[in-house]
């Protein structure tokens, strides 16, 4: 009972809530991949050797679902945080959750991925990259919030269709979010 006020305060923190909800949103991919790691690993425990093509296929499914969970969590955490912030925003001020997800993915890629000969390193796309996914999500949503509140956007005439107008409104927040991630990447590498 003594700790209830402390835990209530933690439960109301929108950043921790976004991390929780972001993980829960990504849970289907995590559970799906778990089936394939079990199918690939359990036979080996009993001395059963799966054919190479079957084993490769099982590990491929696992690697392309659980192996990109950091990328998924970057997007889902950003969306959940943006939705939470939208509930606290002034009227007529809304953060575009789809654009925030895309910017968070780009920011995550900049923070977590390194170039290697002929491609990119996938080492931090999975669970090893979760810190980068949270950093990317938090930066992105806060940059969007700043730009939306301060009206740092490109305004289009009313005759322009809503989707096109929204795309132009998101140019500056997207750009600033990605640039901040670039600066962090440059400073940390």
Residue ranges and their predicted role:
Residues 1-30, 46-189:
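Signature of multi-pass transmembrane helix bundles
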Residues 31-35, 39:
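Hydrophobic alpha-helical transmembrane segments of multi-pass membrane transport/permease proteins
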Residues 41-45:
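Glycine/proline-enriched, intrinsically flexible loops and inter-domain linkers
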């Amino acid at each position: 009972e003594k700790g209830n006020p402390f835990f209530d305060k933690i439960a109301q923190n929108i950043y921790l809530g976004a991390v929780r909800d972001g993980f829960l949103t990504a849970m289907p991919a995590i559970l799906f991949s778990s089936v394939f790691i079990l199918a690939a690993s359990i036979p080996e425990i009993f001395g059963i050797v799966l054919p190479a093509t079957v084993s490769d296929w099982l590990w491929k499914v696992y690697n392309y679902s659980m192996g990109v969970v950091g990328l998924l969590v970057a997007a889902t955490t950003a969306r959940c945080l943006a939705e939470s912030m939208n509930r606290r925003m002034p009227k007529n001020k809304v953060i575009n959750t789809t654009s925030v997800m895309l910017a968070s993915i780009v920011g995550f890629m900049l923070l977590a991925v390194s170039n290697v000969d002929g491609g990119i390193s996938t080492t931090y796309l999975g669970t090893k990259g979760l810190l980068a996914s949270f950093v990317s999500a938090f930066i992105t949503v806060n940059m969007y919030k700043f730009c939306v509140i301060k009206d740092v956007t490109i305004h289009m005439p009313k005759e322009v269709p809503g989707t096109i107008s929204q795309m132009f409104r998101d140019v500056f927040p997207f750009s600033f979010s990605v640039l901040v991630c670039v600066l962090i990447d440059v400073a940390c590498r």
